[in-house]
Structure formats: C-alpha cells, structure tokens
Amino acid sequence: MKLRIKGSSLRLRLTQGEIQQLVETGEVQEQVPFAANATLVYRLRRDSKISDITATYTVNLIEILIPERASREWCATDRVTLEHSQRVPGGELRVTLEKDFACLAPRAGEDESDNFPHPQAPPGSRE
C-alpha cells in the first residue's frame, strides 16, 4: 500500500492483494521504520459505524477508516477511486483511496506484479 501526502491531502493506493486482504480481514497496514525506535504506521480499516471516509492521526499512526458498505462495494467492483473531504482545523483534508495500476512504461526497481492492469495498456499486456 502506497501513501502519498501532499499539502492537505492523503492518498492510499492498494494492489490487488491488498484489496483482497481488506476483504478478508477488514484492514491493511504498512509501516515505515525511522531511527531510534520511531515507526510511522499507516492503516486502512473497515468500520461499520461511520458513514464517510475518515482520517485520524495519533502518535505515529495515520488511520483511514472506510465505511463497511463502501469498502465492500469498492473491493467487489471495477470502481477505481473513493474520495472524501473532511473538515479539519483551518480547512479541509482530502482523502483518496485508489486501486494501484501498473505503469504503462515499466520502471526499473518497481515490482508491479500485483498491481491492477492499466486500462490503457494494449490487450494481452500486463502493464
């Protein structure tokens, strides 16, 4: 699962396997280790008690909650993106969830074997 942070926006991109994990377990989590026992954890978790995608932050944890119904629909269909803006002090935070497509032009060092096939790729092509 990839996390992109830019300004007042968070974007998570999930591979096919991560979508399957969300279906089976209700969550997907990654972590980034830093020096001196500091680790940033980011998690996407299904929640039956919410009605909109919601992001929270506590010490070293970014958690994005997705409504259970929206999660099940997103995972089971060809829908690529879910988005929501939530109010935060001083403005809005835009949260985007996307299925991660393989690039049209392969990049060195990138394993995209579990990414979704790119919709603009030639027929029969993995990219």
Where does each model-flagged region fall?
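Surface loops and adjacent helix of pleckstrin homology
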Residues: 15-17, 24-25, 67-69, 98-100, ...
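Short, structured motif recognition centered on aromatic/hydrophobic residues
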Residues: 3-5, 10-14, 62-66
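Extended intrinsically disordered, low-complexity coil regions enriched in Ser, Thr, Gly, Ala
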Residues: 15-35, 75-88
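C-terminal charged interaction modules
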Residues: 80-127
